């Protein structure tokens, strides 16, 4: 069982000094417990996470800087700094930085399930097909590429 430790995870750093590079995007874990997993992302212009589904987790995004284009259950929407995006489990969603400026956001899922283990395995992995395969083993299912249109 993973319990929450008191303290502060500083801006631009990850919990316990950890950082993941997942296909060029930097992820910083902020809080890790059995019930919740929170992480910060920094997305450069053009970076994205393709449409996928978390069948066993609810997910949230608090946009902290910039604008994110999201495809939520087949519909395109924009989230600006200060906006909170709510994504119930089972809803297809993808996150895209289509702007010409960096975006920063705090993501969290509940419960954690296998997401931290997945990010540990994806760190510095360069093959997108392998990312998709490993993700499916950790309860994150990517949709076919046309779902991103």
Residues of each region from the PLM?
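A hydrophobic/aromatic-rich effector-binding and dimerization subdomain
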Residues: 108-128
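Short histidine-centered beta-strand/loop micro-motifs
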Residues: 28-31, 49-54, 96-98
């Amino acid at each position: 069982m993973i319990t929450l430790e008191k303290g502060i995870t500083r801006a631009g750093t990850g919990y316990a000094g950890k950082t993941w590079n997942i296909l060029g995007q930097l992820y910083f874990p902020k809080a890790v417990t059995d019930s919740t997993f929170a992480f910060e992302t920094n997305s450069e212009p053009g970076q994205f996470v393709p449409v996928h589904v978390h069948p066993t987790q609810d997910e949230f995004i608090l946009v902290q800087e910039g604008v994110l284009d999201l495809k939520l259950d087949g519909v395109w929407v924009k989230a600006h700094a200060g906006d909170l995006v709510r994504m119930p489990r089972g809803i297809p969603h993808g996150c895209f930085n289509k702007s010409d400026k960096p975006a920063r956001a705090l993501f969290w899922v509940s419960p954690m399930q296998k997401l931290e283990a997945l990010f540990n395995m994806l760190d510095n992995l360069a093959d997108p097909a392998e990312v998709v395969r490993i993700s499916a083993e950790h309860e994150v299912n990517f949709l076919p590429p046309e779902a991103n249109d």
